[in-house]
Amino acid sequence: MKPRTLVELSKLGLGNETVVQLRTLELPVDYREAKRRVTGIWEDHQPQLVVHVGMDTAAKAIILEQSGKNQGYRDADIRSFWPEGGVCLPGSPDVLESGVCMKAVCKRVAVEGVDVIFSRDAGRYVCDYTYYLSLHHGKGCAALIHVPPLSRGLPASLLGRALRVIIQEMLEEVGKPKHRAQFEENSTMVLPAKGN
């Protein structure tokens, strides 16, 4: 995903009821580095919700992913590495589900000019791997949004607005209306505001 989309989102914020702090960090398409950084996010910040945003070059719509998979990682990353045995976390469940009901969010989200769909297969690559790790560390308090590449029909401004609406709905879904959000390139953390 292009960082300028998150710049757009940071300009928009998440609305008046939500205190928002935006930061970006691009996660490389690297299994080991993604694992290190995602683990650090959960250990260092203990967020209430992490929303990963990854680009799917074949996507024609924004895709809300319900689950992450533990096995099947056979494609090499940018460093020609893949997890041993194609497994993210040996001994962990095959599938972890998000605590956010993506189907419900998908039904409630309407952004003119952007299709939003629901999926249960995030693709067994670094995005899915990262998502599974977050679901594991956060005990289901994570989400993954796959976005299509930016284009004339989907400029950064429109994608930023769409992500804003989707994340607002996710916050409603988890029932925590007042949060401070920290947005990371390919990972968006939502943390409680101080004093909450």
UniProtKB/Swiss-Prot annotation:
The active site is at E65, C127, H146. It comes from the Eukaryota. It is an enzyme of class 3 (hydrolase). InterPro entries: Peptidase_C15-like, Peptidase_C15-like_sf. GO terms for molecular function: cysteine-type peptidase activity. The keyword Hydrolase applies. Keywords: Hydrolase, Protease, Thiol protease. Its EC number is 3.4.19.-. The keyword Manganese does not apply. GO terms for biological process: proteolysis. Belongs to the peptidase C15 family. This is Pyroglutamyl-peptidase 1-like protein.
